[in-house]
Amino acid sequence: MPVADIEMVTGSAGHVDSKAASEYGTDLRRWRLKVHEGRHMWEYVDEDVAQTQQQTFAENYWLGQEYELPKMSTPIFAQDALDNGWAFFKRLQTQDGHWGCHDDGPLFVTSGIVISSYICGITLPDAMKNEMIRYLLNFVNEDGGWGLWINSPSTVFGTTMNYTMLRILGVPSTHPALLDARDTLLKMGSARALPTWGKFWMCALGAYEWDGMIPLAPEPLLAPGFLPLNPGNWWVHTRNVFVSMSYLFGHRFSAPMTPLIQELREELYDMPYHKIDWFAQQTNISDYDRLHPPTMLQKGLANALCYYEYVKVPYLRRKALDEALFQVEMEVHNTSYLCIAPVSFASNMLVMFHAHGANSHWVKGMADRIIDPMWMCREGMAASGTNGTSVWDTALTVQAALDGGLAQRPENHNTMLEALKFIEVSQITENPLGVSQGYRQPTKGAWPFSTRDQAYAVSDTTAVTVRAVIQLQALKSMPKLVSDERLAEAVDLIIGMENKCDGYSAFEPLRGPKALELLNITELYDNVMTESLYPECTSSVLLCLDTFTKAYPHHRPVEIQSIMARCARYLIKAQFPCGGWLASWGVCFTYATMFALQGLETVGLRESNSETCRNACSFLLQYQNDDGGWGEDLISIREKRYIQDPAGSQVTCTAYALMGLISAHCSNRDALRRGIRWLMRAQQATGEWLPGSLEGIFACPGGMRYPNYKFHFTLSAIGRYIERYGDEALYLKEQ
């Protein structure tokens, strides 16, 4: 057909700013995304640059602007939907070969960075500040407050942190949005009722008194490593946050008084600041924030920590503070100033500011990294839960292309080659400095979740990437960029991450007993004191080892077969009585059940020969909606049972369920057809699928967005369906 006859269609993310948010919007035409080896840097360019350097399709898409594409033909066959979806998604590949996006959701990550930057005297660009304001005003609740994550009920923590952030960014206290927020905050008990995490940030800012929070003594860092009390045995994120918080608590560090801080002291409380009984606030935690009432053991721990502050030994305190500083320095050094995540990045930057000063390479290096977790979403700018998802999303995308037979096509050669190049440069080639002293897991050979600079080994990211690389490099058209030795090194690292009790965790094997959770005084989250066993990580390892041992049958075959058997044994034990598995990183039962059934397929278990798989299929089929799709609510993670999404069927949940059923060789072919048909109906004329409910989880019960999940898991589901059952006409206009 002549070019002039090609019918174009307009697409967009469908976002409209709230009236308050629109006041702070920047000129979206001037935003550009710079990338380098997975690193993201959104930059607001001058007008003349904007005129000469056109925005890419990916920039347009993520900014939520309208774009024009050739109209795709209405899919009749499953292959049509697969081709249309891939044609759209491949356009989102960045110049360095990866697929990137935001993984935002928690509403205290950006505010922590903004507060820390303010204290350290770091000036953020005006465009960045305005877009941060726009983001928050787009996500404000109807009552004027903010919750723990986007679209969650207002809490004292969320409202205080984001009110404070908006004031720092320049929004006046008389702004209608802040008047509403303050009214809601006072109704919930004011900032006096902050949970410990919020009290910490307000203390560091000088808008709360250290006497008002449960002490965070750094002395556990001096405990022998074999004792569970030593933070080296805690979950890696909890450990990193605790170390920096305990350092700042031990020094009673607070920012110098400024007019703004004085104003916040007046605005955040329901009584004059100087009249507050700060010691009485230690146990004053709002019911809007508490996940559970405190146990007697937790109350006893809090009392013991308070008593210890009166009898502490000065020598031990100094030694503990030195150790805390050493740990933070190790973390900042080993991650090229990034830290494991933006949450601990913010508090670690304050530690470096206190210990070394604003002009030190520590603070300057971290200041240069503030941009890394920031993403220009369609609602504005916010920090993600990590410095991106670059390796994870790219490996999953390559796998989707392989599952659908797309990677083999000549027209996709360059796309796959660039992805392989990115994956190759992203492998971690050395261990962190001071592995044992810094409580680190070896990393040589691993692939990280985000970028090589971040430098944390993750079991499932490494497993998914190894599998994708082996299959991609098996294509005749692909060069062998990742050597056999490097793949073997990655598998050796995975083998070393197995838990003694079977199964896999994410960052490191279990180090502490689950009884540590009894001492959880975060008030906000469940199951955050130690690492956990995850069906999704365990299944990813199974899929990886199955692929690896077929390609390299002589590399540690006995060990690999033993590990695969133990992983399968763990999955069978981890199944819930309802028939599903519960995820910790995605929503929720459908996500984990997808992975579990894929993992069990590698050891020959399916619906026809396994009661475990039969029960899982029955579980998934039970929750298929009348329209053919699946839709699970994030609240399932908290309730520990499947909860239907009130918004109805979701693209991601439908893809998860289909992947699981296909892997189990489910005999209910009609259910599979109806699921694929629903995905085809949900596809837009551009080939894309639109955003839906939150796709991910950080820690129970908090939600996150993983916007690429609706693409690569959906493409994998359709591709695997075609591979298993063949292509067929599934969607007719009259249906």
From Swiss-Prot:
GO process terms (BP): ergosterol biosynthetic process; triterpenoid biosynthetic process
Pfam families reported for this sequence: SQHop_cyclase_C, SQHop_cyclase_N
EC assignment: 5.4.99.32
Molecular-function GO term, any one: lanosterol synthase activity
Keyword Glycoprotein annotated: no
Catalytic activity, reaction form: (S)-2,3-epoxysqualene = (17Z)-protosta-17(20),24-dien-3beta-ol
Residues annotated as the enzyme's active site: 460
Assigned protein family: Belongs to the terpene cyclase/mutase family.
Protein name: Protostadienol synthase A
Organism: Arthroderma gypseum (strain ATCC MYA-4604 / CBS 118893) (Microsporum gypseum)
This protein's encoding gene: PDSA
